[in-house]
Amino acid sequence: MFGYAVRRALRKSKTLRYGVPMLLLIVGGSFGLREFSQIRYDAVKIKIDPELEKKLKMNKVSLESEYEKIKDSTFDDWKNIRGPRPWEDPDLLQGRNPEILKTNKTT
């Protein structure tokens, strides 16, 4: 009889029903996140091969270097062409006649 009363009281208790699972989730989640964040610190400790590091430094690209490459380019003949939507025919949209393209491909 006493066991039944205790089980009934525990079942009705909102703290045990909602509070304890919430606390378990918070505490368990913090331990889980600690493990995932530890991966970041472990990855920083790994040293890169010196030869690979030299290659990475050689291929470094900056905004200024890319600007110097395209600075002298002319864009006078540039034409903005909208890309086709999935239901549209790309040849018709870009002003190309598909029948002319077929004859050019066959000859």
From Swiss-Prot:
Superkingdom of the source species: Eukaryota
Family designation: Belongs to the COX16 family.
UniProt subunit comment: Associates with the MITRAC complex. Interacts with MT-CO2/COX; specifically interacts with newly synthesized MT-CO2/COX. Interacts with SCO1, SCO2 and COA6.
Mitochondrial intermembrane side: 38-107
GO cellular component: mitochondrial inner membrane
Segments for region (Disordered): 80-107
Origin organism lineage: Eukaryota, Metazoa, Chordata, Craniata, Vertebrata
Biological processes per GO annotation: mitochondrial cytochrome c oxidase assembly
Primary localization class, coarse: mitochondrion
Protein name: Cytochrome c oxidase assembly protein COX16 homolog, mitochondrial
Membrane topology designation: Single-pass membrane protein
TM stretches of this protein: 15-37
Organism: Bos taurus (Bovine)
Compartments, record wording: Mitochondrion inner membrane
UniProt KW Mitochondrion keyword: yes
Mitochondrial matrix side: 1-14
Biological function: Required for the assembly of the mitochondrial respiratory chain complex IV (CIV), also known as cytochrome c oxidase. Promotes the insertion of copper into the active site of cytochrome c oxidase subunit II (MT-CO2/COX2). Interacts specifically with newly synthesized MT-CO2/COX and its copper center-forming metallochaperones SCO1, SCO2 and COA6. Probably facilitates MT-CO2/COX2 association with the MITRAC assembly intermediate containing MT-CO1/COX1, thereby participating in merging the MT-CO1/COX1 and MT-CO2/COX2 assembly lines.
Keywords: Membrane, Mitochondrion, Mitochondrion inner membrane, Transmembrane, Transmembrane helix
Pfam families, alphabetized: COX16 (PF14138)
